[in-house]
Amino acid sequence: KNLRILSFLHGIYLSDASDNLIVGNELKDNLNSGVWLTYGSSFNVISGNRMFGNYYGIAFEWSSFNTVAQNEINGSTVGILVYSSSDNIIFKNRISFNINGIVCNVQSRRNIIQCNDIVSNSGFGVEIENSHDHRIIGNSIRDNWAGIYLHESYNNTIYHNNIMHNSPHQVYIYQSTCVWDDGYPSGGNYWSDYQGSDSYKGFGQNQFGSDGIGDTPYSIDIDDVDSFPLFAQITIFDVGVWNGVAYHIDIVTNSTVLDLCFNPNEGPLFRFNVTGDDGTNGFCRVAIPKTLLWVEDGWTITVGDQPVTDYLELEDESFTYLHFTYNHSIQTITIRGTRVIPEFPLVTLTLMILILATLTTIWKAKRKH
């Protein structure tokens, strides 16, 4: 923890080592890797480190069930290598100015690549080679030579990513199959070169009215399409953890969106700010977890001090989706439901009960004396 490790073969090396925490280190100019995990190293957490100029920023070799979160990795040949390793979580890292961003290869399986910023790598943003069953969700993959490269890989699922300005290839596919959307109304990915419109809604996009989903599929190659491309960039806001479940609210919008605030103590509502060029039209498509905030008789939506009555409400098993439009300026949007998740998580409530029980016992014991 909090070490500065420069110019070794490996900055930190774990072999058959589990349950370690690697946090807050600076790992620079190491010949092979900043962090190397091998031979069954598992259940390790690598978080909050800064890595620059290592050949591999972080490398997994035959190692599974590890978490890599909130690291900054740049100046490497490969930012994160997952070699014959499975069930790892790669979450909220910034991986930029490497040759390749994230590489999963040699029969790696079921790794989750989520909410990372994968930017300005001179090769591939994400490379999946001879590896299967990955979930690539909620990432910003932009300004790379190729955003995503798939080579002889199957059953990978890719949605809710912002795939932007990767040139010459947004995606490069060789003998691979994957799913490019999460169905309707959840949707697929935002593509910066999508040329379609949003005048229709519904699973078949054949009912008049906008829904934040492009009216026509995004064609990736002759065999692959994103059937429900998002019509603007998606922003994913973490709003808290209750009963061990992390909740997020997702907003697809052509506005700049900032400062989402959700506090159950304030009631069944949340608010966020939007900005855009005056005189233009803005829209939001907001995905709200059903177990976080819900209604009994309609949502109350205000933009500034103006109520929104003409909104579209859709739902699937887990989320409610609200789509509405407004005139651009600096605005605060408030969305109010009827009921909200309990203010105190179950774990916290149980702990409070135990503390109160203990204090009561102590108080009774003192009274006897």
List each language-model region with its residue ranges.
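Consensus "Asn ladder" position of solenoid repeat domains
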Residues: 2-3, 20, 25, 30, ...
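Glycine-rich beta-solenoid repeat tracts in large extracellular/virion proteins
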Residues: 10-16, 33-40, 56-62, 78-84, ...
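Acidic, glycine- and Ser/Thr-rich low-complexity intrinsically disordered tracts
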Residues: 109, 137, 154-245, 318, ...
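Surface-exposed beta-strand/loop patches in extracellular or lumenal glycoproteins
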Residues: 172, 275-296
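C-terminal beta-strand-rich structural cap/linker in extracellular carbohydrate-active enzymes
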Residues: 230-233, 315-340
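Carbohydrate-binding surface patches
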Residues: 252-285
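Short, threonine-centered small-residue motifs that mark membrane-proximal processing/anchoring sites
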Residues: 339-349
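C-terminal membrane-anchoring or membrane-association module
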Residues: 359-369
